[in-house]
C-alpha cells in the first residue's frame, strides 16, 4: 500500500506488522537512517531511544536524527547532556544523535554524520535467536 501526499505524489509505503517488536525490527533492517519527528505518542520516544541504544550497542551504524522544530526536543537533549555530566552516559555517546530545527539542516547534518562513539559490542556479535515460540521476522508469513 502506498501513501499519497496531497499532491498525489507517492511519498512512502505502509507496512502492516503484528506488533511493536516487528515494527522496530523491520525499520532497523530496511531504514538507511532514523528520524524522530514531533510525536504525540510514547511510541515515538520509545522507538527513538531504542534506535539510540542499538547504535550505542553496535547493532547498527545508522544516523539517528531529531527534527527539533521550535525546540520540541530541547528538554530531551538537555536530559542527555545531564546524563553525560552525571556520568550515566559516556561523552562519545552524545554524538549518536543529530538534531536540527529544520528538515533541510537535519538532512545536511545527517549526510555528514560518521559514527564516532565506541560501541559496547561489535555489530558481528549480535545474533537473532528465537525467543520461545515467537516467530522471527518474515518467518511463516504468506508470500
From Swiss-Prot:
Origin: domain of life: Eukaryota
InterPro entries associated with the record: LOG_fam
Residues that hold substrate according to the record: 23-24, 41-47, 53
Catalytic reactions of this protein: N(6)-(dimethylallyl)adenosine 5'-phosphate + H2O = N(6)-dimethylallyladenine + D-ribose 5-phosphate; 9-ribosyl-trans-zeatin 5'-phosphate + H2O = trans-zeatin + D-ribose 5-phosphate
Pfam family, one: Lysine_decarbox
GO CC field: cytosol; nucleus
Gene3D superfamilies cross-referenced by the UniProt entry: 3.40.50.450
GO MF annotation terms: cytokinin riboside 5'-monophosphate phosphoribohydrolase activity
EC number(s) recorded for this UniProt protein: 3.2.2.n1
GO process annotations (BP): cytokinin biosynthetic process
Keyword annotations of the record: Cytokinin biosynthesis, Hydrolase
Similarity comment: family membership: Belongs to the LOG family.
Role description: Cytokinin-activating enzyme working in the direct activation pathway. Phosphoribohydrolase that converts inactive cytokinin nucleotides to the biologically active free-base forms.
Protein name: Putative cytokinin riboside 5'-monophosphate phosphoribohydrolase LOG9
Organism: Arabidopsis thaliana
Lineage: Eukaryota, Viridiplantae, Streptophyta, Embryophyta, Tracheophyta
Amino acid at each position: 500500500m502506498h501513501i499519497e501526499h496531497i499532491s498525489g505524489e507517492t511519498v512512502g509505503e505502509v507496512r502492516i506488522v503484528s506488533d511493536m517488536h516487528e515494527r522496530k525490527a523491520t525499520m532497523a533492517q530496511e531504514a538507511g537512517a532514523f528520524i524522530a519527528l514531533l510525536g504525540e505518542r510514547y511510541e515515538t520516544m520509545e522507538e527513538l531511544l531504542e534506535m539510540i541504544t542499538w547504535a550505542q550497542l553496535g547493532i547498527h551504524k545508522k544516523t539517528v536524527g531529531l527534527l527539533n522544530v521550535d525546540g520540541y526536543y530541547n528538554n530531551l537533549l538537555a536530559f542527555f547532556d545531564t546524563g553525560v555530566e552525571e556520568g550515566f552516559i559516556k561523552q562519545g555517546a552524545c554524538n549518536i544523535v543529530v538534531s536540527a530545527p529544520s528538515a533541510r539542516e537535519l538532512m545536511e547534518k545527517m549526510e555528514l554524520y560518521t559514527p564516532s562513539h565506541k560501541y559496547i559490542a561489535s555489530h558481528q556479535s549480535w545474533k537473532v535467536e528465537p525467543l520461545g515460540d515467537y516467530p522471527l521476522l518474515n518467518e511463516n508469513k504468506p508470500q
